[in-house]
């Protein structure tokens, strides 16, 4: 059981506190990755968890809840949310990497 996801946008935090398109967007847009719905492990070109000390699923997702996973890299964390509760085959995701890619959004199947 896994999601296959494609990156649509990458955002970074601006000095004025707003979100802006990240310099990483050009290289990451259109990239894909897979997420284990059992372990929260992410494999692919972007936001991989290979070097994480641990990964875990916080919420498996349901008709009412999003799928949520977290990766602990020791000195930073990464979170991922997929709107599992939407009743359609393609579901939006958002990921936040503290000290990493920033905020990544897109679609999962």
Describe every region a protein language model picked out.
Residues 4-45:
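Short, solvent-exposed loop/hinge segments that bridge or flank secondary-structure elements
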Residues 10-12, 44-53, 97-101:
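Short, solvent-exposed aromatic-acidic interface loops
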Residues 18-22, 78-92:
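Extended Gly/Ser/Thr-rich low-complexity repeat segments
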Residues 28-29, 74-81, 100-104:
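Short, surface-exposed coil-to-beta transition loops
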Residues 38-78:
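Contiguous, well-ordered beta-strand patches that form the walls/edges
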Residues 88-103:
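Short, exposed beta-strand-loop hairpins at the edges of beta-sheets
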């Amino acid at each position: 059981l896994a999601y296959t996801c494609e990156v649509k946008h990458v955002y970074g935090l601006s000095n004025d506190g707003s979100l802006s398109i990240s310099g990483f967007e050009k290289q990451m847009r259109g990239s894909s990755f897979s997420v284990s719905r059992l372990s929260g492990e992410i494999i692919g070109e972007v936001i991989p968890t290979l070097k994480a000390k641990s990964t875990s699923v916080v919420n498996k997702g349901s008709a009412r809840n999003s799928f949520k996973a977290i990766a602990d890299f020791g000195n930073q964390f990464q979170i991922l949310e997929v709107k599992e509760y939407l009743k359609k085959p393609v579901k939006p995701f958002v990921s936040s990497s503290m000290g990493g890619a920033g905020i990544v959004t897109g679609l999962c199947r």
